[in-house]
Design a protein with these regions (language model features):
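Anionic coordination/interaction segments
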Residues: 1-143
């Protein structure tokens, strides 16, 4: 089964299916602050040391579940239905939910579309800083 490909022009690994056999992760960071993020926004953040300086709780024996993580939830106020900008943790049916993850050097972009709502979340650590940015863009394509 094909889960993605390398984009030579943009120097990114592009994951085209969110249901990978295990979490495919990327490292974001600076010397003082780091983060590990998977193709479904799972992972953790840490200051200086991934072993001793964790900021976001992460259970290494929970890797198969790829949780907790950096989840952005989206809700349709009319129907009450909700989903996440990354496939996990809600895991809507793949026949209806489209997703793409682009792991680049020091950034990850997760894009999705469900029920005519597009989302794109860029995750990165600004160079030399001790925080991470989650920049979200949500577009209703039905209007």
């Amino acid at each position: 089964m094909n889960y993605g490909h390398f984009d030579e022009q943009n120097k990114e690994y592009v994951i085209t299916r969110p249901d990978t056999p295990s979490a495919w992760a990327n490292y974001l960071g600076s010397p003082e602050y780091g983060a590990i993020i998977s193709n479904n926004a799972g992972g953790y953040s840490f200051e200086k040391s991934g072993a001793n300086g964790r900021i976001i709780r992460y259970r290494f024996n929970g890797v198969a579940n790829d949780q907790p993580g950096r989840y952005i939830y989206i809700k349709d106020n009319e129907s009450g239905e909700y989903w996440s900008g990354s496939w996990s943790p809600v895991c809507k049916p793949l026949e209806e939910y489209k997703s793409e993850c682009r792991h680049g050097t020091a950034y990850t972009i997760i894009s999705s579309e469900y029920k005519k709502i597009k989302s794109e979340v860029s995750y990165y650590v600004p160079q030399g800083q001790t925080y991470e940015v989650w920049a979200a863009k949500i577009t209703n394509t039905d209007s």
